[in-house]
Amino acid sequence: MSLLDDILQHNKEYVEDQNTGYVDTDTKCSKMPSRQMAIVTCMDTRLVNFLEDSMDIGRGEAKIVKTAGNCITGPFDGVVRSLLVCIYELGVNEIFIIGHHECGMAKTTAKDLTEKMLARGIAPEAIHMVKREMEHWADGFTHPGDNVEETVRSEEH
């Protein structure tokens, strides 16, 4: 059985076990974050079911945007687009940028990524097209704390 098959089977069992009215009538939980907050954080697997508990955040209380190294790489990248929706459509008033120790992005380099991409069959021409951007975000992250400070500075205005 593949990983996808395992996940689909678990999902089927999970849905069958749920209260049938849950999806349509759950008035306790809204798409609008009740604490009017958004968090930009890392996609690190160690943060799953950890970050929210450490901040006393429950289901429906915050919007959480995850990205490698909690990086915002440009004025209209996917993170910024998500934050714009959070602010202007979902009532978010505060944004928290949260990093963590031992972030893998601190050791990631454009050179290493390029080598691994080539080894997996990505065409050199395709890599060349994104080389400058990849160098900007992969080589620009050296320390989690510094990255949080830089991200906050870049988004304050």
What are these regions (language model features)?
Residues 43-46, 101-105:
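Gly/Ser/Thr-rich loops at beta-strand to alpha-helix junctions
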Residues 30-46:
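N-terminal low-complexity or amphipathic/hydrophobic leaders
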Residues 1-35, 70-79, 87-92, 103-155:
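Divalent-metal-activated hydrolytic enzyme cores
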Residues 52-58:
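Short Gly/aromatic-enriched secondary-structure transition segments
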Residues 3, 58-67:
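Short, basic/glycine-rich phosphate-binding loops at helix/coil junctions
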Residues 48-51, 106-108:
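Short glycine-/acidic-enriched loop or helix-start segments at secondary-structure transitions
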